[in-house]
Amino acid sequence: MNTRKKILLVDDDLDLLEQNKLLIESKGYEVITAVSGKEGFEVFKKIKPDACVIDLIMEEHDSGFILCYKIKNDEHGKNIPVFILTSAAYDTGFKFGASTSEEREWIKADALIHKPVIIEEFVEKLEAFYELKK
């Protein structure tokens, strides 16, 4: 399992933020939250989390991508998983992913997590990332 890894969760929807925080905490993780891309990066620099989960669309349509880009260009961020949380496929029918190296290079995220979050899928992706790093 995990040794109480810190997860930074960034979402401007306060209800979903709290719901996802409780879901992730139920699996033994410590969750620190932020409600915007700007606050998310400030918290990231301060706490140096073990992973980040970032909503795609917050104050701007590309806020999640921008925050992900900033984190992945930070020395600490290069070595941790960053997941984009999105309901874009559900809302628009437009599907995109992070399964190929080209897609991951473009969006900078290690994986996409579709809303609503299925906690088992999230934990599986997170643990798979750490297994690859061993």
Predicted features and spans:
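Non-catalytic signal-transmission and effector/linker regions of two-component phosphorelay proteins
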Residues: M1-K6, H114, I118-K134
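Conserved sequence signature across two-component system core domains
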Residues: V10-D11, A34, C52
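Two-component/phosphorelay signaling modules centered on CheY-like receiver
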Residues: L14-I32
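Helix N-cap/capping motif at the beta->alpha junctions
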Residues: T33-E42, S63-G64
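Short amphipathic alpha-helix used as the core "switch/output" element in two-component signaling
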Residues: E42, F65-K78
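Active-site beta3 strand of CheY-like receiver
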Residues: I47-I54, M58
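His-Asp phosphorelay/catalytic-motif detector in bacterial-type signaling
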Residues: K48-D50, H76-P81
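Alpha4 helix (beta4-alpha4-beta5 surface) of REC/receiver domains from two-component response regulators
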Residues: D62-I66, A88-I113, E120, E124
